[in-house]
């Protein structure tokens, strides 16, 4: 009898774990279904804008209006490329083919490249992006493209939620073995509850802002794979600071 009770207890625990796993799988499937439905809309919106303004452009004679249409095409092309890149990165993560190629890089030069790229992107916005904190010299053994992807994702996210103001980017050493990167903005900020879930997949706190809801989740994966930590500090209506740390290796 004792043996029967013991095995029944084991079966109940196994059933409970199975039921919990099935519920999580169902939630994941629902999220993926909602994601796919949302993506068809997210991709169609910039694509329609690109096609529409491209068709109108040959018939425009006013130079100022022509420049405006060209800027709109460029903006929507960047958005479409970001959407596609996020989806491709997710598929690589799921397939286990999300690769890294570390090498010794010049950190100041890399962040200056990001700053120049973002300033060009923001030339018609009421937002500035500035590289504000650095070491006189700094080399780091890491994947340059992934570092750029991390900071660019943070900055693009900040742009979405900052109508007017400043986005600041920088880095410093926390200790001899840890380097700390950050992107701060003066945007709308988030609640403490939102901060808890912001790095989860498919999370979007503003349905009017276009995107996959994958960018920050992908950042979390990159930082984890590089052996660092990631986080956010934010207050509603006060702005946000997204940050990550990496091992400070030079070989």
Regions found by a protein language model. Give the residues of each.
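Alpha-helical segment immediately C-terminal to the catalytic phospho-histidine in histidine kinases
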Residues: 50, 55-81, 109
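Short conserved segment of the HATPase_c
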Residues: 52, 190-202, 242
């Amino acid at each position: 009898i004792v043996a029967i009770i013991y095995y029944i207890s084991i079966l109940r625990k196994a059933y409970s774990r199975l039921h919990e796993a099935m519920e999580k799988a169902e939630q994941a499937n629902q999220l993926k279904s909602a994601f796919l439905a949302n993506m068809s809309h997210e991709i169609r919106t910039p694509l329609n804008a690109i096609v529409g303004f491209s068709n109108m452009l040959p018939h425009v004679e006013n130079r100022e209006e022509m420049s405006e249409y060209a800027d709109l095409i460029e903006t929507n092309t960047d958005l479409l490329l970001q959407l596609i890149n996020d989806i491709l990165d997710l598929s690589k993560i799921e397939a286990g083919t999300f690769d890294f190629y570390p090498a010794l890089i010049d950190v100041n030069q890399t962040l200056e490249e990001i700053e120049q790229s973002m300033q060009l992107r923001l030339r018609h916005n009421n937002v500035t992006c500035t590289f504000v904190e650095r070491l006189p010299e700094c080399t780091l053994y890491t994947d340059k493209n992934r570092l750029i992807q991390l900071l660019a994702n943070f900055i693009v996210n900040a742009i979405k939620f900052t109508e007017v103001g400043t986005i600041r980017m920088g880095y410093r050493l926390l200790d001899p073995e840890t380097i700390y990167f950050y992107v701060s903005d003066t945007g709308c900020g988030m609640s403490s509850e939102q901060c808890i879930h912001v790095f989860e997949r498919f999370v979007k706190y503003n349905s009017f802002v276009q995107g996959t809801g994958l960018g920050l989740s992908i950042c979390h994966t990159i930082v984890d794979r590089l052996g660092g930590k990631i986080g956010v500090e934010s207050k509603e209506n006060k702005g946000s600071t997204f940050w990550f740390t990496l091992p400070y290796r030079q070989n």
